[in-house]
Regions:
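Short helix-boundary/re-entrant hairpin motifs in multi-pass inner-membrane proteins
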Residues: 29, 36-51, 71-77, 134, ...
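Transmembrane helix-loop-helix hairpins at membrane boundaries of multipass inner-membrane proteins
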Residues: 1-89, 409
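Alpha-helical transmembrane segments and their membrane-interface junctions
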Residues: 321-342, 400-410
Length: 410
């Protein structure tokens, strides 16, 4: 019964999304049934919490995906574009839950399905560039590693899962699929991608953490420093709002990798911080998507002063950015509260200090700069402003509350 439920729950939104994708359903029906499916999944997870011996971290990761899916669908209005967005969110929800909840070959099948969906989504944009070819090669390698990892020896299995982990907890240069899918996604889909993408990466890293050697830890810390510097510089010069959020996410993800050797027991500090990061970045992306649906806004600085004519938007964005500014501190203090540090070598301490300063100071710079380009300043007089609807505001607040619970309480 337990194993069957682990497969059935992800199939509910996946099959609904696939059926609706190739049928002419009304947008209101898609949204209502999508919310109903999420309610059934939430009830199923609640039942599993008490009826079966399921690892608490797995339920926490699955619950994070369900909450993000709820928020991504809840704020949609009744239109054909919103219907397409809800369908994409349901497909992502089903595939992501299948990866988190299941084991061995079933997990690999869901992961290959998600990677295939990513490739199809990117290919639909018909961008035949060298970077696109690299992304497709990356996805192909991830599919091969996912399918073959079940049959590999223990050592090769660790490297295969590590490749998938650095893809979904993106480090430079493995971040290209993440940047492209966030850039190409419409509306709230980009927000949901951020949460589901990082959640899958956290689950993969949790699996292989005990198998990582000291040499791997050192290499990953060095790569994390390079990734943080590169992504922070990319965020500072980024005008496209979706790429700004994606680059900022990559910069902060570097902290997860960089502190792996500082604190033991990744499950106790890494997963809560990763989910907090996903909710905050997903919340900013969701807030931006609501403005983009109204005005087609994609470039930072084009619509300044939004906090004045759109007070709900202003409050939500200021709170999210304030939370984002303190993200590095959440991870450090949450780690120190539950365990001692284990780093003793001077070179490791130096790299970690550089990483922390780059992410914190760089993040403070580009987040405040973004805030001044959007919420503050003088609003344009030629734009018919309309503030966030109640459902949109609730969706953003739900992600904020989720981030607070994960970062402070859990």
């Amino acid at each position: 019964m337990n194993n069957a439920l682990l497969v059935i729950l992800p199939l509910i939104p996946l099959l609904l999304g696939l059926v609706w994708k190739y049928s002419n359903c009304q947008s209101m029906a898609v949204k209502s049934l999508g919310l109903g499916a999420i309610g059934v999944i939430a009830a199923g997870l609640f039942y599993m919490r008490f009826a079966f011996e399921v690892e608490s971290s797995i339920l926490f990761l699955a619950s994070a995906i369900v909450l993000a899916g709820l928020c991504a669908i809840l704020g949609q209005e009744n239109s054909q574009q919103s219907s397409d967005i809800c369908i994409s969110n349901l497909i992502i929800l089903g595939l992501s839950l299948g990866i988190i909840l299941n084991q061995a070959m079933i997990k690999s099948v869901f992961l290959c399905g998600l990677l295939g969906f990513i490739a199809i989504s990117i290919n639909s944009k018909h961008q035949n560039t060298f970077r696109t070819k690299l992304i497709f090669l990356h996805i192909l390698l991830a599919i091969i590693f996912s399918l073959s990892s079940v049959l590999m020896g223990e050592t090769l299995q660790v490297f295969a899962n590590l490749f998938i982990a650095v893809t979904f907890l993106p480090l430079v240069p493995f971040h290209l699929p993440f940047l492209r899918i966030i850039k190409d996604s419409k509306g709230s889909v980009s927000s949901f991608w951020i949460v589901s993408w990082l959640t899958i990466g956290l689950e993969k890293l949790n699996i292989i953490y005990a198998s990582l050697t000291s040499e791997m830890f050192f290499s990953l810390t060095l790569l994390a420093v390079v990734s943080a510097v590169f992504a922070s510089l990319a965020s500072l010069g980024q005008k496209c709002n979706s790429l700004f959020i994606a680059s900022a996410t990559v910069a902060h993800v570097a902290l997860v990798w960089g502190l792996l050797e500082v604190f033991p027991h990744f499950k106790s500090w890494g997963i809560p911080f990763g989910i907090t990061l996903a909710f905050v970045m997903g919340g900013i992306s969701l807030t931006f998507s609501f403005v983009q649906q109204r005005y087609g806004w994609k470039t930072l600085g084009i619509l300044p002063g939004l906090a004045s004519p759109m007070p709900r938007f202003g409050v939500a964005l200021v709170l999210l950015v304030t939370f984002a500014l303190f993200l590095p501190l959440f991870q450090t203090f949450s780690g120190l509260m539950v365990m001692p540090t284990i780093v003793t070598q001077d070179v490791e301490i130096l790299m970690i200090s550089i990483l922390f300063l780059v992410v914190w100071l760089g993040g403070s710079w580009y987040f405040i700069q973004m805030l001044h380009q959007t919420a503050f300043g003088e609003a344009r007089s030629d734009v018919p402003y309309s503030d966030l609807r109640l459902t949109e505001f609730i969706a953003i607040w739900a992600l904020l509350l989720g981030a607070s619970y994960s970062g402070v309480i859990y």
